[in-house]
Amino acid sequence: MKRTYQPSKIVRKRRHGFRARMATTGGRKVLTARRSRGRKRLSA
């Protein structure tokens, strides 16, 4: 059986990276929420 998590740096950055978050309204809301919570890392 193939495992669900097949790590890839490129896919990780494209899907969850800062640029991907900034590209959509919802993504920007995610960043705002994470900033307000004082997260050390905003995105992948």
From Swiss-Prot:
PROSITE patterns listed in its UniProt record: RIBOSOMAL_L34 (PS00784)
Pfam (any one): Ribosomal_L34
Record keywords: Ribonucleoprotein, Ribosomal protein
Gene3D superfamilies according to UniProt: 1.10.287.3980
Matches recorded under InterPro entries: Ribosomal_bL34, Ribosomal_bL34_CS
Keyword Ligase recorded: no
Gene Ontology molecular function, alphabetical: structural constituent of ribosome
Cellular-component GO terms for this entry: ribonucleoprotein complex; ribosome
Keyword Ribonucleoprotein applies: yes
GO biological process: translation
NCBIfam families referenced in this protein's UniProt entry, alphabetically: rpmH_bact (TIGR01030)
Listed PANTHER family: LARGE RIBOSOMAL SUBUNIT PROTEIN BL34M (PTHR14503:SF4), MITOCHONDRIAL RIBOSOMAL PROTEIN 34 FAMILY MEMBER (PTHR14503)
Entry similarity comment: Belongs to the bacterial ribosomal protein bL34 family.
UniProt protein name: Large ribosomal subunit protein bL34
Organism of provenance: Brucella anthropi (strain ATCC 49188 / DSM 6882 / CCUG 24695 / JCM 21032 / LMG 3331 / NBRC 15819 / NCTC 12168 / Alc 37) (Ochrobactrum anthropi)
Gene responsible for this protein: rpmH
